[in-house]
């Protein structure tokens, strides 16, 4: 089941809500998700494999943007069900591009209208859903609020009805196929995105240099790459306060995910123009499509 949509419609929040635990990072900033991320939900006789995808966007100014779009579009292939996520039914330019790809897909389709809790006048909800149903007459519509866990049972029921029968691919306890190294790098990036202004988060990437278990703790060394010296200064903050705060917040989340004490060391380095350098982004782990 691929979850697709433009940036910032709540795809990662929806995945986390459906799984009942957080595996995909979130922030209020668009393009937080950079990789396809598999989430596995097993309940009784059902196992659903969800794929959270980067937001599809028309503007591709850098190699990183092209990678993200390529990742998202690759998820449209070989899936049984496609969830097209819309923010309160609004369809803008980027949504039109997703709609075009959605219509071309041979998968079973569901339109998920998210953030219904933010609709102030609830009387507008039914007319909006009716207009969408006219535009997509053969597609099932499900209004939800991923943030408030509203109507997710109905969405899961619709998904299960659309999925074919097949054996389980993963153990019932498994929630993702991503490594712990990947998950901890994403946790650091989430904390940075939440701490920093609008532009800087997009110039940041994380590389885990060391991931060792010893003395009843996991020891992690992480390098945070930025593109300019000025960005490095902003990220570190006055007397290192911002970086220290990011490290503390990240460590708490890591301990929750890993279930052990974490010793985290972080460094900030400049890698000029990495986000528009195909070779650099591959070396930094953006090479899975």
Give residue spans per PLM region.
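Canonical P-loop GTPase G-domain recognition
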Residues: 108-110, 117-180
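Conserved C-terminal guanine-recognition region of P-loop GTPase G domains, centered on the G4
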Residues: 41-47, 67-141, 212-217
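P-loop NTP-binding site
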Residues: 180-289
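Conserved G1/Walker A P-loop phosphate-binding module
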Residues: 1-81, 223-225
């Amino acid at each position: 089941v691929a979850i697709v949509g433009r940036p910032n419609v709540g795809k990662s929040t929806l995945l986390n809500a459906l799984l009942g635990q957080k595996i995909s990072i979130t922030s209020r900033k668009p393009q937080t998700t950079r990789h396809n991320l598999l989430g596995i939900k097993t309940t009784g006789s059902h196992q659903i494999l969800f794929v959270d995808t980067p937001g599809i966007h028309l503007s591709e100014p850098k190699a990183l943007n092209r990678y993200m779009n390529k990742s998202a579009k690759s998820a449209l292939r070989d899936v049984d069900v496609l969830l097209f996520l819309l923010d309160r039914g609004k369809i803008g330019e980027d949504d039109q591009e997703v709609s075009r790809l959605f219509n071309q897909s041979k998968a079973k389709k569901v339109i998920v209208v998210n953030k219904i809790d933010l609709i102030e006048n609830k009387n507008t909800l039914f007319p909006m859903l009716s207009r969408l149903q006219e535009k997509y007459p053969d597609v099932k519509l499900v209004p939800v609020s991923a943030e408030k866990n509203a109507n997710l049972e109905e969405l899961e029921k619709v998904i299960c009805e659309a999925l074919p029968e097949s054996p389980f691919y993963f153990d019932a306890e498994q929630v993702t196929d991503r490594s712990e190294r990947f998950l901890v790098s994403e946790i650091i990036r989430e904390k940075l995105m939440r701490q920093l202004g609008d532009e800087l988060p997009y110039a940041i990437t994380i590389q885990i240099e060391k991931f060792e278990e010893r003395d009843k703790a996991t020891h992690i060394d992480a390098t945070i790459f930025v593109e300019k010296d000025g960005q490095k200064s902003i990220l570190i903050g006055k007397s290192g306060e911002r970086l220290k705060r990011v490290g503390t917040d990240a460590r708490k989340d890591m301990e929750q995910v890993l279930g052990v004490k974490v010793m985290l060391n972080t460094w900030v380095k400049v890698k000029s123009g990495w986000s528009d350098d195909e070779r650099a982004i591959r070396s930094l782990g953006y090479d899975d499509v």
